[in-house]
Amino acid sequence: ILNDVIWNKKNPMPNFRGTRFTNAHETLIWASKSEKSKYTFNYQSLKCLNDDLQMRSNWELPICNGSERLKKNGKKVHSTQKPEALLHRILLATSNKDDLILDPFLGSGTTATVAKKLGRNYYGIEKEKNYFKAAEQRLRKVKPIEDDYLDTLQNGRSKPRIPFGSLVELGIIKPGTTIFDNKKKISAKIMVD
């Protein structure tokens, strides 16, 4: 075991019967096959998510609700659907772009959804047809996150920025030049003050 992580649910479901404590947390186990096994830990990426502080092993995240919650005919598709924020943190911490993520209990497809957004490859296994269909529909709608954002997260730091005015001062960009965004949809003409 490399770590155990406590997911403290900010908004846990109450125990309406009053027969036990409210399930307000879940324990995640991060393990490797052996002490000599290689594993990924993106320390800087987690610092980037945590105001440049080392990530702790107790995470305060809400349960899945609102528009993220999959519903069919007004009812939850899956009773224990995990929030994307939880899987985002897990996959960002323990994998890299183009890695393969396996979820042997696909459920509503949260792990695969986040893997696709983060540029990871994924396999999901699910025996319940209703869950599988819901996950499949969900995954069709997912768009990967922009590479610039992923690079910043993966490297833990933003690329150095150069003041635009210095590009003109150094003659790299000439006044009167028209520049475009990478999709050629937005343009701007360089003017001198």
Annotate each predicted stretch with a short phrase.
Residues 1-134:
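Core catalytic lobe of class I
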Residues 133-193:
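PRPP-dependent phosphoribosyltransferase catalytic core
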